[in-house]
C-alpha cells in the first residue's frame, strides 16, 4: 500500500490525513490546535504541523505530502530567513483603509483586470501597504513575502532561519501554487504572472518593492522538493527511495474543491463561521464590483468565489434565543411552511461582505401575532442563512458560472433542515457529502499527483441528495426586504 499525506493548516488548527493512494481510503489522522488571534507567530504553525504529523503516526511509511492552508496571510521574512513580525491573517481587518486607498489609486476595474479581484482587507497586498505605512522599520527589512502554506512547505523541505534549519535561508527556494498566489492581489490567474509593478507601487516606498523575493508558482501536479533532514523527522526517506515528495500545496478552498472532486457545473457551498460559494471554471473570472474574487484553482483551472460573513453563527444565535440545540432547531424549522409565515431574517449580525454592508445589523421582518412562532423563527433563521448564500450563487451566475449541482459542506450542512431548505432556495439539486476533512483530502490527492504524475481518481461519498423543491416565496420575500 502506497500512502500519501495531506495537511489542512487552517486558522484554528492543523489537520493531517494519511490516505491509501490507490483507493483514497483514510488510513489515519492527526490534529493539533493553533493559537487564537488575527496575528500569529508562524512558529506556532510549524509546532502544530509537527504535532499533527506525529499524531497521525509520522511520515516513515508515507511517500508524499502536500500542505493546503488558510489564504492571504502575510508572512514577511528578512534576508536571514527570519520572520520579521507575527503574520497578519486573512481575518485581520486593520488594512481596510489600505484596501480603500489602493482602490482609489488604481480603480476597481483596473485591479480586477490585472489580478482577477478587487482587494479587501483580507488580501495580502493590503497588508503590505499597511505595513509600509504603519511599521516602516519592519517594511524596510522585508526580503521575501510568503503565504502560510508557502512558509510551511519551505520549512518542511529543510529551509528556514540561518542556524535553525539544515538548508538555511535560501529564499529563492520559496514556492507556492496558483490557487494561493491568486489571493495575494499581486498575481494574475489570467496571465499566470506576478504584477511586480502593482506590488512596487503598493509597497515600493519601503525601498524593497522591486527587490522582494516572491515564491515561485509551480504547476499543480509538480513537486516542490522532498522533506528535509529535520530534527523533527530524523528519517525523511519515508516510503520512497528518493525521499518524501512534497507537493505544490494549495489555498484552503481550492484544496476543498480538489478533495470533493468538484467539476464543471458543481458549485460548492461551504457553511462554516463564514460562508463561501465557489465553482471550478475553465475561464478566468473578473468582477470589478468586488463581489466575486477571481481566484485560480488547484488543477490549472479557475475558482471564482464569493464570501459571506454570516453563516453558521446565524443558527447559533437563533438556537440560543429559542433555548434549543441545532438538531431541535432543524426539527422546528421543518415544521413551518416555506416562507416562515412571512417572517424574514436579514442575518447581518456581523455586518456583511456580500452585499457589502459592513455597518449593517440583523433585522427580523414580518412579525405579527400570527407569524411570530418558534417554528417560523427557526425556519426564518435557516432561510436567511441560505438566502445570503444564494446571493453569492447569483453573483457567480451573473459572471457566467453554470450551476447544475450544489455540493453543500460544513458543519451546518449536517442539519436536516439546512439540506431540505437549500433545495428550495437554490433551485438546484443539492448533494451533501459524507462529513470529512476535504481540504486535507485535497492536499493528499495533490500529493499523489506529485508522486505519480497522475491525479488520483478518488470518489466522494454522498450522504444525502435533495432534488429541487422550488419554493419561490422564500426568495421573493428576501428580495423584497433587501430592496426596501
Role assignments for model-derived ranges:
Residues 4-8, 16, 62-67, 145, ...:
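Short glycine-aspartate micro-motif
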Residues 49-63, 134-139, 196-209, 392-404:
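Phosphate/pyrophosphate-binding loops at sites that engage ATP/ADP/AMP, CoA/4′-phosphopantetheine
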Residues 9-11, 112-242, 247-250:
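Gly/Ser/Thr-rich active-site cleft segment
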Residues 66-69, 88-91, 115-123, 142-148, ...:
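Active-site nucleophile and cofactor-binding loops and adjacent substrate-binding regions
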Residues 76-79, 156-160, 164-172, 227-231, ...:
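Short acidic, glycine/serine/threonine-rich loops at helix termini
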Residues 1-2, 71, 84-86, 140-143, ...:
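Short coil/turn connectors at secondary-structure junctions
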Residues 1-30, 67-105, 279-285, 296-484:
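Glycine/Thr-rich phosphate-binding loops that ligate phosphate moieties of nucleotide
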Residues 26-61:
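N-terminal phosphate-binding loop and adjacent alpha-helix
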Amino acid at each position: 500500500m502506497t500512502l500519501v499525506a495531506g495537511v489542512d493548516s487552517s486558522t484554528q488548527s492543523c489537520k493531517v490525513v494519511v490516505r491509501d493512494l490507490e483507493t483514497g481510503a483514510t488510513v489515519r489522522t492527526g490534529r493539533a490546535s493553533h493559537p487564537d488571534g488575527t496575528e500569529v507567530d508562524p512558529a506556532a504553525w510549524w509546532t502544530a504541523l509537527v504535532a499533527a504529523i506525529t499524531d497521525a503516526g509520522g511520515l516513515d511509511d508515507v511517500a508524499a505530502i502536500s500542505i493546503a492552508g488558510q489564504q492571504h496571510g502575510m508572512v514577511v521574512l528578512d534576508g536571514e530567513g527570519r520572520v520579521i513580525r507575527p503574520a497578519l491573517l486573512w481575518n485581520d481587518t486593520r488594512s481596510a483603509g489600505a484596501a480603500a486607498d489602493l482602490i482609489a489609486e488604481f480603480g476597481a476595474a483596473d485591479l480586477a483586470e490585472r489580478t482577477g479581484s478587487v482587494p479587501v482587507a483580507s488580501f495580502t497586498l493590503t497588508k503590505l501597504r499597511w505595513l509600509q505605512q504603519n511599521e516602516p522599520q519592519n517594511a524596510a527589512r522585508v526580503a521575501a513575502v510568503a503565504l502560510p502554506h508557502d512558509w510551511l512547505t519551505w520549512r518542511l523541505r529543510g529551509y528556514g532561519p540561518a542556524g535553525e534549519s539544515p538548508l538555511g535561508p535560501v529564499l529563492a527556494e520559496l514556492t507556492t501554487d496558483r490557487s494561493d498566489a491568486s489571493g495575494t492581489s499581486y498575481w494574475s490567474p489570467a496571465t499566470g504572472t506576478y504584477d511586480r509593478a502593482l506590488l512596487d507601487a503598493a509597497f515600493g516606498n519601503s525601498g524593497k518593492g522591486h527587490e522582494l523575493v516572491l515564491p515561485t508558482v509551480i504547476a499543480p501536479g509538480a513537486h516542490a522538493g522532498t522533506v528535509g533532514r529535520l530534527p523533527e523527522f530524523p528519517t525523511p526517506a519515508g516510503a520512497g527511495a528518493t525521499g518524501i515528495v512534497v507537493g505544490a500545496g494549495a489555498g484552503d478552498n481550492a484544496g476543498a474543491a480538489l478533495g470533493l472532486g468538484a467539476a464543471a457545473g458543481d458549485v460548492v457551498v461551504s457553511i462554516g463561521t463564514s460562508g463561501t460559494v465557489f465553482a471550478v471554471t475553465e475561464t478566468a473570472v473578473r468582477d470589478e464590483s468586488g463581489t466575486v474574487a477571481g481566484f485560480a484553482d488547484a488543477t490549472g483551472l479557475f475558482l471564482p468565489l464569493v464570501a459571506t460573513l454570516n453563516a453558521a453563527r446565524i443558527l447559533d444565535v437563533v438556537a440560543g434565543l429559542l433555548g434549543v440545540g441545532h438538531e431541535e432547531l432543524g426539527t422546528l424549522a421543518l415544521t413551518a411552511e416555506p416562507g416562515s409565515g412571512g417572517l424574514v431574517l436579514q442575518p447581518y449580525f456581523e455586518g456583511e461582505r456580500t452585499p457589502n454592508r459592513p455597518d449593517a445589523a440583523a433585522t427580523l421582518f414580518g412579525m405579527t401575532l400570527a407569524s411570530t412562532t418558534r417554528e417560523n423563527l427557526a425556519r426564518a433563521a435557516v432561510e436567511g442563512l441560505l438566502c445570503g448564500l444564494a446571493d453569492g450563487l447569483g453573483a457567480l451566475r451573473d459572471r457566467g458560472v453554470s450551476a447544475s449541482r450544489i455540493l453543500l459542506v460544513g458543519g451546518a450542512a449536517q442539519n436536516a433542515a439546512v439540506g431540505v431548505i437549500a433545495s428550495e432556495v437554490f433551485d438546484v439539486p443539492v448533494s451533501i457529502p459524507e462529513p470529512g476533512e476535504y481540504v486535507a483530502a485535497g492536499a493528499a490527492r495533490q500529493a499523489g499527483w506529485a508522486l505519480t504524475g497522475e491525479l488520483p481518481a478518488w470518489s466522494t461519498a454522498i450522504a444525502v441528495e435533495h432534488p429541487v423543491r422550488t419554493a419561490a416565496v422564500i426568495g421573493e420575500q428576501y428580495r423584497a426586504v433587501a430592496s426596501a
